[in-house]
């Protein structure tokens, strides 16, 4: 009896899928791998991580905003609407979970946080700004860049209910976002990724030099990261109001997006590796430059300066110099 194994009711784990983690996969291959490597007991999401060439310590190199993907797979958020004159009775007509004015702001200050998103008007921001320690640390503070500070509440509420994803670079310049679910159609997830990459590429900052999108990784919840080779993407265009939308009239395969062209240019300018099989070529011009640099680096020896002969002024020479002890004794003996 002691040697018998205990019988448990745990569900068996899915067999692990072996794949080369150093290899770059196409978007479609990466999505399929992310689905296969999902071993969670719950319905896992497909997450994307986009590494951008940004120095987030600088205020002009931070990216944040909202994007509406072709297919929304996120969670339904509990929405709180704040405006002067609103009450909880108005929540049903607006189609949100909670609605109110200064009374609800007072409840938040006491610790009430039964919501995931705040949509408000500019008039309420002075009161909300006092709750920075409560809302700011949880990422709930409304911001005009995120689109949840507006004068048109019905329109903004409708957009967020359809599915608007907020994005913001972290301290390392990464953007994380859910682009699908493990049971979703692969084609829909691929379309979301293509649109998101083109959208981010269109948001390139003028202060950035070189490649803007450096790396793209895909993974399922609690799954391994999969490197993505971005070789094809949808083409986007900007409307008169500056909104980025998909350009169905353009042929995506014939037009390369900006970040792909930069990637090719960077690969051409890449320096040769220091591997012994591929040694760097040293030309005569480089040798001459090195010699010049070495000459400048060595300090030149100072030429010996000949000492000038000391000219004795006759007027100053007549002054008596201080007598030595031996001279004083000789003077005393001579007087005797």
UniProtKB/Swiss-Prot annotation:
This is Large ribosomal subunit protein uL1. Residues 306-315 have a biased composition (Low complexity). Part of the 50S ribosomal subunit. One of its GO terms (cellular component) is large ribosomal subunit. It comes from the Bacteria. SUPFAM superfamilies: Ribosomal protein L1 (SSF56808). Residues 286-305 have a biased composition (Basic residues). Signal peptide: none annotated. Residues 1-245 are annotated as: Large ribosomal subunit protein uL1. It comes from Malacoplasma penetrans (strain HF-2) (Mycoplasma penetrans). InterPro entries: Ribosom_uL1_bac-type, Ribosomal_uL1-like, Ribosomal_uL1/biogenesis, Ribosomal_uL1_3-a/b-sand, Ribosomal_uL1_CS. Residues 246-336 are annotated as: Unknown. Belongs to the universal ribosomal protein uL1 family. Binds directly to 23S rRNA. The L1 stalk is quite mobile in the ribosome, and is involved in E site tRNA release. Residues 267-336 are annotated as: Disordered. GO terms for molecular function: rRNA binding; structural constituent of ribosome; tRNA binding. The gene is rplA. Coiled coil: none annotated. One of its GO terms (biological process) is regulation of translation. Keywords: Repressor, Ribonucleoprotein, Ribosomal protein, RNA-binding, rRNA-binding, Translation regulation, tRNA-binding. NCBIfam families: rplA_bact (TIGR01169).
């Amino acid at each position: 009896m002691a040697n018998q194994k205990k019988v448990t009711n745990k569900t068996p784990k899915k067999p692990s899928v072996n794949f080369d983690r150093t290899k770059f996969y196409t978007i479609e291959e990466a999505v399929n791998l992310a689905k296969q490597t999902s071993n969670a007991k719950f319905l896992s999401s497909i997450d994307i991580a986009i590494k951008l060439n940004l120095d987030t310590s600088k205020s002009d190199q931070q990216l944040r905003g909202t994007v509406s993907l072709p297919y929304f797979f996120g969670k339904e958020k509990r929405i709180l609407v704040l405006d002067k004159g609103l009450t909880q009775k108005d929540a049903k007509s607006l189609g949100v979970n909670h609605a109110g004015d200064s009374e609800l702001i007072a409840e938040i200050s006491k610790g009430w946080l039964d919501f995931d998103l705040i949509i408000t008007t500019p008039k309420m921001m002075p009161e909300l700004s006092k709750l920075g320690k409560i809302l700011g640390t949880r990422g709930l503070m409304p911001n005009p860049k995120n689109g949840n500070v507006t004068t048109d509440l019905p329109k903004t509420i409708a957009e967020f209910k359809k599915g608007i994803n907020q994005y913001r670079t972290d301290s390392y310049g990464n953007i994380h976002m859910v682009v699908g679910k493990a049971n979703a159609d692969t084609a829909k997830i691929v379309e979301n990724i293509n649109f998101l990459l083109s959208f981010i590429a269109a948001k390139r900052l003028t202060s950035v030099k070189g490649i803007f999108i450096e790396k793209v990784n895909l993974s399922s919840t609690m799954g391994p990261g999969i490197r993505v080779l971005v070789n094809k993407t949808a083409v986007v265009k900007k409307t008169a109001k500056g909104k980025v939308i998909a350009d169905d009239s353009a042929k995506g395969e014939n037009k390369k997006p900006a970040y792909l062209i930069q990637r090719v240019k960077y690969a051409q300018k890449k320096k040769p590796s220091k591997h012994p099989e591929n040694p760097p070529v040293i030309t005569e011009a480089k040798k001459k430059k090195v010699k010049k640099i070495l000459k400048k680096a060595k300090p030149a020896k100072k030429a010996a300066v000949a000492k000038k002969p000391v000219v004795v002024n006759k007027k100053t020479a007549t002054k008596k110099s201080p007598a030595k002890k031996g001279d004083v004794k000789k003077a005393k003996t001579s007087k005797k």
